[in-house]
Amino acid sequence: MSLATLTVLGFSLSADAFAAALGKGAGARRPDLLEAFRVGAYFGAFEAAAPLIGWALGLTFAARIAAFDHWVAFTLLAGVGGHMVIAALRAPKAETAEASKARQKRALSPLRLALAALATSIDATAVGIGLAVTEVNILMACALIGAITTVVAAGGVLLGRGAGPLLGRKAEVLGGLALIGIGLKILIEHLSA
């Protein structure tokens, strides 16, 4: 598989991570460049590991994985997104600065980032299964996919950061709805295939 093909694959797989990171950036309290790359690294690491796992599983387990991967992705994304929406809607209208800071810090908690990254990378496992039957340097492919996703997701956080102050709490609601929408998209694509 050519470097150009792998690059296109990397950008394609990073689209869901970008959307999720956009919501994370909008719901967070002014994330800086370092924090944006920390978030990007979560998404990049999961996106790099998923094809490797899929490749290792190979074609033997393809039918078993395909039978439920979309449900796992949907459940994780809908759960994280739903929690973001509920938390934003339940937050008091006149929130103290401390309460606002704590809520926004939770948006970038390691657990929430890991769940969102896991959910957006499940499709990459199926891609890895497909890569098992092609001539590809799987380590190079995974490294490239991870690097692209890291940069794209970090960009999503920074773009979301700009939208966050303009939208206020609505940004967190929109971010949560975006995650739910990604989950629904994955579910519908797999159920209609």
From Swiss-Prot:
Pfam families: Mntp. It comes from the Bacteria. The keyword Manganese applies. InterPro entries: Mntp/YtaF, Put_MntP. GO terms for cellular component: plasma membrane. The chain crosses the membrane at residues 3-23, 39-59, 65-85, 113-133, 138-158, 173-193. One of its GO terms (molecular function) is manganese ion transmembrane transporter activity. Belongs to the MntP (TC 9.B.29) family. Probably functions as a manganese efflux pump. This is Putative manganese efflux pump MntP. It comes from Rhodospirillum rubrum (strain ATCC 11170 / ATH 1.1.1 / DSM 467 / LMG 4362 / NCIMB 8255 / S1).
